[in-house]
Amino acid sequence: MDREERPDVDSIYMQAVQALGQQGGWPLNVFLTPGGLPVYGGTYFPPERRHNLPSFLDVLQFLIKTWKNEQEKVTKQTKAIVDYIRQSSTREKRNTDLDDLSFDGEEKTQKLFENHYDKLNHGFQFQSNNKFPPSMGLSLLLRHHHRTGNANSLIITENTLKAMKFGGIYDQIGGGLSRYSTDYKWLVPHFEKMLYDNALFTTALIETYQVNRKEEFAGFANDLLQYIDRDMTSKDGAFFSAEDADSEGVEGKFYVWSKEEIEKILGRKTASVAIPFYNVTQKGNFEGKNILHIKRNSETVAKEIGMNHGDFLKELQSAREK
């Protein structure tokens, strides 16, 4: 079952697995009674035993034996789990009178994001170095700014969006946002691209433009929409849910470049523009190759190499097209 198509069903069985004392996550494998009640579950079960994990066949054999010999006990346990989920899902009816609505939750969440804001690299620093596109969080900050006039909420949003646009998490040539950055600088992505990330991020960009009317955010949103239309839309109008991180069995191979490859493909003149703009070096920044990223704007780089800015932009566009 596609959990993105039925998140409600996914949520129920995820709660069941956690109630059984197992670690939640995906892929989620849950074994059910004929009536659909959860008996046992977990995430990944390998084809053969390894790292103290039972194989998928081991789990099947165990469950067949248990169901055959202890069906009454299993049924009792499954009903207890269902009762637990039902109770935990029950919420007191709330008065929906608008006068009773509170923005306490928004205020607390805004303060949480503010406290975890990475002032140097932007985005939010929590327990690990990984940084995920915080699209919904940025939308909340925009709403907080709109309601209260809090300038910091807007500044945090703008800085985070720009840091991701210029970082390695964004495919500087083909477009599209990777699933997350494995470092706090937004440089080294997990190269998989998810449809929902790009759609939600586009929404955050459009909402930012609605607030500040700065064309760079509308332009970035348009770039992402073009990427979705070109690479994540099938000929019959359906959407692909993701682009794989691997190319020819190697993670990220399609997205990283050596200096020699760039010079060979682009030619001397165009390469002389692309190499400094995308911070390409002989040594590289990822396993001997380069994840393209931007540290300085085009005007600055054009001035450094002594080129007219208009000519510089033409060569840069030529580099992207090649």
Protein language model annotation of sequence segments:
Residues 1-322:
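Replace the tail clause
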